[in-house]
Amino acid sequence: MLSINNFIELKENLEILLAEQNLSHELISGLHDQVEHTLIMAANEAIIDRHPGWILCEGRRAAELYLCRNWRRGGQLEDEKTRLRVLAEQMRKDFIAAQNERIDLRPLERIMRDLDEQNHFTAKVLGEEPLLILSAGCSHRCFSALCRPYIYQDDSFSCDIYLFQRTAEDHGTSWGSILLHELGHVLNLRLTGDISAAPDDFLSFAEPFFPGLSTKYRTSAPEFFAHCFAMGVASRPGLERYDAFLNIQNEHKQLFDAYMRSKIAQL
């Protein structure tokens, strides 16, 4: 039913679908079945590839998984149309045409596998649902990447990470570093249950390095946590090319890596 290669084309397809005069509940159900099947197939392939906790993809599959995760089924035809209309409108506000930057997913897959080998990241940090890492194939009006959390009634969670194409002026930071930053948000959510907070012991640990973090800059602590996770992991042998914090002493980066390793090990 869908003929799409990125999030922008997904929005356009939804708008065309919603404009149809004879749109039926059966057609909408068929669309949902299609994207749900895509998620099942992607999850099965991840199991075969020995990384059941995360799915990394681009193109049509990424767009269909975005729709599947952000579309909550239920209700009559008008209820379904309203949900899809709200989603399409939000996409119109957030996403803009591609900047012709191709995101190479191979280094990102290597990072995920390294974290699993070194820290059992998938088993200890991720929720029961797979982490979706989706290359949007378009740009966002404000961000190069986003971590989208889902908190469920039983206090469990899952996350998606969206990667957006950037303008040429914004290419200074590697995609590996950007992914590590977003994974820092995922770890923070696992530790605190609140992506807008940071662990109390992180505030005391990081205060000597970032004076005022626990007081004046406390609201920025979650971003500092994600930065510190990224720079800690990037201090490891073989991952130095993802280091976006060249002005910080390597010994300090390694201290933060040790802190993050200990937090993961305790989970």
What are these regions (language model features)?
Residues 3-19, 23-267:
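Active-site-flanking segments in enzyme catalytic domains
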